[in-house]
Amino acid sequence: MTERIRARGPRSSSVNSVPLILDIEDFKGDFSFDALFGNLVNDLLPSFLDEEADSGDGHGNIAGVDGLTNGHLRGQSAPLSSAPFFPEVDGLLSLFKDACKELVDLRKQVDGRLNTLKKEVSTQDSKHRKTLTEIEKGVDGLFESFARLDGRISSVGQTAAKIGDHLQSADAQRETASQTIDLIKYLMEFNGSPGDLMELSALFSDDSRVAEAASIAQKLRSFAEEDIGRQGASTAAGNATPGRGLEVAVANLQDYCNELENRLLSRFDAASQRRDLSTMSECAKILSQFNRGTSAMQHYVATRPMFIDVEVMNSDIRLVLGDHGSQPSPSNVARGLSALFKEITDTVRKEAATITAVFPTPNEVMAILVQRVLEQRVTGILDKILAKPSLMSPPPVQEGGLLLYLRMLAVAYERTQELAKDLRAVGCGDLDVEDLTESLFSSHKDEYPEHERASLKQLYQAKMEELRAESQQVSESSGTIGRSKGASISSSLQQISVTFVTEFVRWNEEAITRCTLFSSQPATLAANVKAIFTCLLDQVSVYITEGLERARDSLSEAAALRERFVLGTSVSRRVAAAAASAAEAAAAAGESSFKSFMVAVQRCGSSVAIVQQYFANSISRLLLPVDGAHAASCEEMSTALSKAEAAAYKGLQQCIETVMAEVDRLLSSEQKSTDYRSPDDGIASDHRPTNACIRVVAYLSRVLESAFTALEGLNKQAFLTELGNRLEKLLLTHWQKFTFNPSGGLRLKRDLNEYVGFVKSFGAPSVDEKFELLGIIANVFIVAPDSLPTLFEGSPSIRKDAQRFIQLREDYKSAKLATKLSSLWPSLS
């Protein structure tokens, strides 16, 4: 377009140049107004373009800017004013006018062309619409033709289908009629003479057509039996016509089927010996027509070597039980059963491969095989290892007792369950192998709870007999090792042993493990667990109660020994010395029995804690699923342990009696009348406690050390509180036997300080309060008679005890204290 505009445009810059000629073609394609404008004015402005280029290079200024350097702009611009500044403007104006005129003309030409094209398009659109309408009418007619054709085709197809059905039905009827004719012919052959199978068609004696013969024989047999059944029903109704039936045919067919089945089984056995799986499969397929192949399946399973070889059973017994005559252990039996059942599983897996390749219904054969394995081979070995013992005369513990049977039962049950899972994985058809496995142990599981309880009882009795035997042996040998040492050993053997209780719990825990194994239902499990745990409660209750009673017997013997050496007042010095020596021995026996009982109490508490912890960790979770079971067991546990608590309470009372008796003996033997009424009153008094006080505190510290260790919690607090109260009463009674002067009163205060310091270790506030009051009361021996009325002004509650103590003052009569105090304390009168 640029070249065309240049060709038509004038080359001169004159205003009267030839007008431009613009063409419509110049505006087609990639039109650019800048290019059009440039081509119009480039020929008229060559000098302007050159100046513009020079200005772009930066070497001059437009309109003579260089003249400004001297500052004489007016002088320099005067010569330039005679020429026009832009001379090409007239030419450009003329050019633009001509271009505008031609553009208007071109627009008119374009508008004319557009109007013409619109008319042509409208005409063509009308023709096109008319054509489309005609085509739509033609298409509608075509669719109607297709619909009529489709209906015709459908009608013809239905007719053809009916004809085909008729032809197929006719062919089937023809085939059935042909087969019926053949069957009737064969049936007549079998309905000949009874037992005569020699005149049969060649089909029934051709070994290559055995399958066909078997199929036909089964059909004939079914038909004949149905016909006989219909005749029997008609005869029973009274409208039968006497005539010959198909009894002969049925009998002959039965004989033939039996003979054919035996022949096929013989061929099957021969092929089995050769491992000819294809022949075996062919025979099995044919035999499946006889009683669904049950005879073939059972025959195959029955002929397996593991069921007919006696050596296999002997090998099983040797593998599980070991050499003949040896006592099998549960661990050895477990290993033997694992090895045996692995061998059985491998054998069944190999047989499964053969069965799958041979029989048309392998799952049914596998069910028969697995059932035979469990009922014959597994049951055979279980009968050898699980001889149910009698509860009336159980085997002795030395030979394993009932526990050996229970352990064997658990091992056998676990291993058989594992075998059942393995056989299920190999495949056993529709056989409920788990239920069958359970049935193998049903007789054992029915009586299991009784055997478990009897076993626990047997173990406990054996342990007690062992303990009694050891104690008896020590008693018999005490003459050799010394009576005191022998008695000490015997006493230690009779003490409660936490180790024994732990062993009882271990027996029970093992029994609970077996109970969980054998009891699948939560209710049954809870009932059995409760019964077994009750056995433990009975055992622990009896054991610790008897242990506490034995410890109480020692306390009673020590008490009897003390009573034996209580003497009167008028005895000789020699007798008194002997009695004192015997009393020391009785005191030593009492102290020893006290410590022994505290050890028994401590071990009793530890034993109870072990049982309670065992119940919380192992028993309670098994009882919670059943309503009321947990609460009932908790109540039984409380009842069972209450007997031991009662024995412990009685023993602790005896311990207090023992301690008080020895304290009384020490006070009586060691306390001198001069301790509290020294003849040298007024001289510097002795600030040491009396010898009796020292002996009593030393004894109490020594003997109660075991009580502090053995008792805890509320039991300890109650025991020490009772002991402190008894000690306070005993001291009051003891001091009322003496007369006190002021120095004796100070000695008494020193004794009281010792007692108060000791009883503070009891941690019993009520006891501390009583001994503090004793310290206040003891002041009556120290103060002057005139100060007595004001001594108890703030403590009226102790005036009664103070009254008794005031009467013990040495100057009670001489100072006429009774008269002085009667007016203040009326109770003194």
Swiss-Prot record:
Residues 244-266 form a coiled coil. Keywords: Coiled coil, Cytoplasm, Exocytosis, Secreted, Transport. It comes from the Eukaryota. The keyword Cytoplasm applies. The keyword Transport applies. InterPro entries: Sec10-like, Sec10_HB, Sec10_N. Expressed in seedlings, roots, leaves and flowers. Disruption phenotype: No visible phenotype, due to the redundancy with SEC10a. GO terms for cellular component: cytosol; exocyst; extracellular exosome; membrane; plasma membrane; plasmodesma. Pfam families: Sec10_HB, Sec10_N. It is found in: Cytoplasm, Cytosol; Secreted, Extracellular exosome. GO terms for biological process: acceptance of pollen; exocytosis; Golgi to plasma membrane transport. Component of the exocyst complex involved in the docking of exocytic vesicles with fusion sites on the plasma membrane during regulated or polarized secretion. Involved in polarized cell growth and organ morphogenesis. During cytokinesis, involved in cell plate initiation, cell plate maturation and formation of new primary cell wall. Belongs to the SEC10 family. The exocyst complex is composed of SEC3, SEC5, SEC6, SEC8, SEC10, EXO70A1 and EXO84B. Interacts with EXO84B. Binds to EXO70E2. This is Exocyst complex component SEC10b. It comes from Arabidopsis thaliana (Mouse-ear cress).
